[in-house]
């Protein structure tokens, strides 16, 4: 086999490389977050970033796959209030639609006080609108998730009204 031009990959190999690249892209698109779960090595900011990535691709590879990841990082106290995954998913879809399939998210500086952390986030939704949220996390003191940062609550911060001068 001769390359069609100096330095180019022979034609049969170009097709093979293209197919391999497309297959790799399909795997990444199908599961952009991977298997994310609480771990003591994850910082509060890393936990929020993982949850935001899951929300940005909420229905990949299957419906609510991203919400299952977010629920996996919900603290035991949060889970007791929000119920099983199905109820949690409905609550997020109804109460936080701007977070689903959002375009971008930028983290503010983290505020920590011992085993409690507040992580501000500015998010641009799929329609291009800006939203601000605060994630409250706590470091779990015992049990299955000992020393893991997990989300206790998320609330939207209303825009400040403009002051006329």
Identify what each model region corresponds to.
Residues 2-16:
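Bacterial N-terminal signal peptides that target proteins for export
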Residues 12-26:
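Bacterial N-terminal signal peptides
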Residues 27-30, 35-38:
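Boundary at the C-terminal end of the N-terminal hydrophobic targeting segment
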Residues 38-46, 61-65, 82-83:
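Soluble non-cytosolic domains of exported or imported proteins
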Residues 43-59, 69, 73:
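Short, aromatic-enriched amphipathic alpha-helices that serve as compact interaction elements
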Residues 60-61, 80-81, 160-163:
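Short, solvent-exposed loop/turn elements at domain surfaces
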Residues 63-114:
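Short solvent-exposed beta->alpha transition segments
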Residues 110-165:
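Exposed beta-sheet edge and beta->alpha loop/turn motif
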């Amino acid at each position: 086999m001769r390359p069609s031009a100096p330095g180019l990959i022979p034609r049969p190999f170009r097709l093979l490389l293209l197919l391999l690249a497309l297959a790799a892209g399909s795997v990444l698109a199908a599961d952009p977050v991977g298997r994310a779960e609480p771990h003591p090595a994850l910082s509060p900011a890393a936990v929020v970033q993982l949850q935001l990535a899951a929300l940005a691709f909420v229905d990949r590879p299957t419906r609510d796959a991203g919400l299952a990841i977010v629920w996996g990082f919900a603290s035991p106290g949060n889970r007791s209030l929000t119920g099983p995954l199905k109820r949690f998913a409905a609550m997020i879809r109804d109460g936080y639609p701007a977070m689903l399939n959002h375009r971008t998210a930028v983290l503010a500086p983290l505020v920590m006080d011992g085993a409690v952390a507040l992580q501000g986030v500015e998010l641009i939704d799929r329609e291009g609108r800006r939203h601000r949220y605060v994630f409250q996390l706590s470091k779990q003191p015992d049990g299955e998730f000992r020393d893991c940062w997990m989300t206790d609550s998320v609330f939207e911060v209303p825009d400040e009204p403009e002051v006329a001068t």
